[in-house]
Design a protein with these regions (language model features):
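C-terminal anchoring/interaction modules
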Residues: 1-59, 134, 142-179, 183, ...
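Helix-loop-helix transmembrane hairpins and adjacent membrane-interface loops
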Residues: 90-95, 142
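A conserved hydrophobic secondary-structure block that centers on an alpha-helix together
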Residues: 116-124, 149
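Hydrophobic/aromatic interaction determinants used to assemble and anchor large protein complexes
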Residues: 287, 296-310
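Long, internal scaffold/assembly segments composed of regular secondary structure
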Residues: 320-323
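Charged, compositionally biased non-catalytic regions
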Residues: 96-119, 222-225, 229-234, 243-244
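Short alpha-helical segments and helix-capping/turn motifs at coil-helix boundaries
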Residues: 124-129, 393-395
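Small/polar, repeat-rich beta-turn/loop motifs that tile beta-strand-dominated architectures
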Residues: 142, 273, 310-317, 544-549
Length: 633
């Protein structure tokens, strides 16, 4: 092994001491998380004993000695999978707020950039993964960083001198990705300061990564990891790095989860992987490979002076870094209902397949065959040598106990049949169902709000800081624009060029509350009808109300579907113009009435008689109409 200089030894010592401080608490967390993951996956000890056998007949023969059903009722799974889609079903709607004068004109540009970045990484799916980790383990971890990636690309291009003929281009290196990203970090590979209860007051965190030999070589070739190939003063070479091995076997961390998923983990193997410890303290980052080589050291990669990690805890416990998962409070109830249902299944098996006591001197065991059209020849009374052992019936109290366990699970988790969408029939009134759904909705809203404040808002600040730090040239973004009703292309788009100057200023990030929740389509349709009715009120802006109603109906860019209104000329301007040209206003109003009368279809007479008269004379003269209130242009 190469001899490290004093500076490298100091870096290695900092990370090594931090790792040793964090490992005991993290090992305790992993042991608890293994149990929670087995409950989430519906894993039983019987399956664990059965999995290693290549031929499962051996396992079956051993199980026959101690028979019994091994049922697993997936309450933990249904609880987690009921909450997570109600928390995150859509991408968040970010709100960028200016905090100084320089940011006043730039917050719109920053929002366009952040929305484009989050869309290209499927941000809502990342939030689901982080949220699910929090619901299962009590801790979900996110990370923000700037990702730069180059790849080899081949594209079609016009042949030289032949513009109508295309051919493949020469493979060229292109920038495939150059933007801020948010990632999910496996809680099993995230270690923290044991004296902290949040990232904000942690002295450090360590992100453990597993790398293959090809990944290590690529990082050295790109100059990210140090070696003599890119730094002549470095004491180690790429060959030294590839010859190292991880101190912690990845299989030791993953075996319990792989076993819960049904994979064979009993075979002896050596993981040909490298273990990287990425140390962050908010001021610098140090990466140590295989607990031996400090391959990277530099300033904090975040745009902020903070640790670029975020944690989500669905239920926060004061003074503790890890919160309470959704599985932890109901795990003993899960074990209890598994046992109860398995015992009931065993009782049914005993009732269907009776146990007999027989006289072994009178009956050959091979003659004891049960089935349709079966008979055993005997000499004498069969009751003298064959007697069915009585099996007591299962008490009805077991069903009441099962319902009590289910009620306890639902009361603890807040997830009941009405919340899951199960038809309750006539057992529940409509008001009762609404009250249950409202109570569960408040609990889920609280967990979603914690996800917004702990993950989305914090990562939004990181996105702003990273963009202000790493975007150094002008970039083009396509954004929807207000379409022209006279054009057929809806939706309409425009290209916006945004550079570093258009992103400057002190900004804050907020998220529209509940924007990640699933849309209530029936409620939106009902609200849309209300907006359509309000648009008929002359006191309100009908166009804005129509646009809002179409938006609730799910129409993209509804402005393009609203016909432009004819502008109205104020009555005072019309009257002033008529007086200027010497025309009485009531004469102009009479002329408008005549124009409307000639264009309108004739109305039928009510009784066929002449028009009404004033006494016996001609039709009465009508007083001049009032001055017009407005004339369409």
């Amino acid at each position: 092994m190469p001899v490290l200089d004093d500076a490298d030894k100091q870096l290695l010592d900092v990370v090594e001491r931090a790792y040793r401080r964090s490992e005991p608490d993290h090992k305790t967390f992993r042991d608890k998380a293994d149990e929670f993951y087995r409950l989430y996956r519906g894993f039983s000890d019987w399956r664990q004993e059965q999995t290693p056998y290549r031929d499962q007949d051996d396992a079956v023969s051993e199980a026959q000695e101690e028979w019994g059903a091994e049922l697993f009722i997936p309450f933990c799974f249904s609880t987690v999978e009921t909450i997570i889609p109600r928390m995150v079903s859509n991408g968040p709607r970010m709100i960028v707020v200016p905090r100084d004068e320089q940011a006043l004109g730039n917050v719109r540009n920053m929002k366009l950039v952040i929305d484009a970045q989050q869309k290209q990484i499927n941000y809502d799916l990342i939030l689901q993964s982080i949220g699910k980790d929090g619901l299962i383990y009590g801790l979900g971890v996110g990370k923000t960083r700037w990702k730069f990636e180059q790849r080899i690309q081949v594209k079609a291009q016009a042949a030289p001198g032949l513009p109508n003929i295309f051919q493949e281009s020469v493979p060229t290196t292109v920038t495939a990705f150059d933007d801020a990203v948010a990632e999910r970090v496996d809680p099993y590979d995230f270690m923290w300061d044991p004296l902290s209860d949040a990232v904000e007051n942690a002295e450090y965190v360590i992100h453990r990564m597993w790398l293959g030999p090809a990944a290590v070589k690529r990082l050295v070739d790109q100059g990210i990891y140090r070696s003599q190939e890119n730094d002549p003063s470095c004491p180690w070479t790429l060959e030294d790095l590839l010859a190292g091995r991880a101190r912690t076997q990845r299989s030791n961390v993953w075996d319990q989860r792989l076993s819960a998923e049904g994979y064979n983990t009993e075979s002896t193997r050596q993981d040909a992987l490298h273990e990287a410890w990425e140390f962050h303290d908010g001021q610098r980052v140090i990466t140590v490979l295989d607990a031996s080589y400090p391959v990277q050291a530099g300033p904090n990669p975040s745009g902020l002076a903070t640790i670029p990690f975020q944690i989500y805890r669905p239920t926060i416990v004061g003074g503790r870094f890890v919160g309470i998962s959704e599985i932890e409070p109901i795990r003993h109830l899960q074990y209890e209902i598994n046992t109860l249902r398995s015992q009931r299944r065993d009782a049914a098996t005993l009732a269907l397949m009776r146990t007999f006591a027989y006289n072994e001197t009178a009956v050959d065991p091979q003659d004891l065959v049960f089935g349709p059209n079966m008979g055993i020849p005997v000499s004498g009374d069969p009751r003298d040598f064959l007697f069915p052992i009585p099996v007591p019936e299962l008490p009805n109290s077991s069903y009441r106990e099962e319902q009590a366990i289910i009620d306890d699970i639902q009361r603890t988790s807040g997830i009941s049949d009405p919340v899951q969408g199960v038809d309750t029939g006539a057992s529940e009134t409509a008001t009762g169902v609404q009250l249950v759904q409202a109570a569960a909705g408040l609990r889920i809203q609280n967990k979603a709000r914690l996800l917004e404040t702990q993950i989305i808002v914090t990562q939004g600040y990181e996105f702003v800081a990273l963009n202000q730090r790493r975007i150094l040239t002008s970039r083009s973004y396509s954004v929807p624009t207000k379409p022209d009703p006279n054009q057929q292309y809806i939706p309409a788009w425009e290209i916006v060029h945004i550079g570093p100057a258009e992103l400057m200023g002190r900004m804050a990030v907020e998220v529209e509350g509940g924007s990640t929740a699933p849309e209530n389509v029936p409620q939106n349709r009902q609200d849309a009808m209300q907006f359509f009715q309000l648009s008929q009120d002359p006191r309100l802006d009908g166009e804005k109300l129509l646009v809002r109603g179409l938006t609730l109906m799910g129409v993209d860019q509804p402005e393009g579907y609203v016909k432009a209104l004819n502008p109205q000329v104020p009555a005072t301007q019309v009257e002033g113009f008529l007086n200027a040209v010497g025309i009485a206003p009531h004469r102009f109003a009479q002329w408008l009435d005549e124009q409307q009368a000639t264009s309108a279809p004739p109305a039928p007479l009510s009784s066929g008689g002449p028009p009404p008269v004033n006494g016996n004379g001609p039709p009465a003269e009508q007083p001049p109409p009032p001055a017009p209130q407005g004339v369409p242009m």
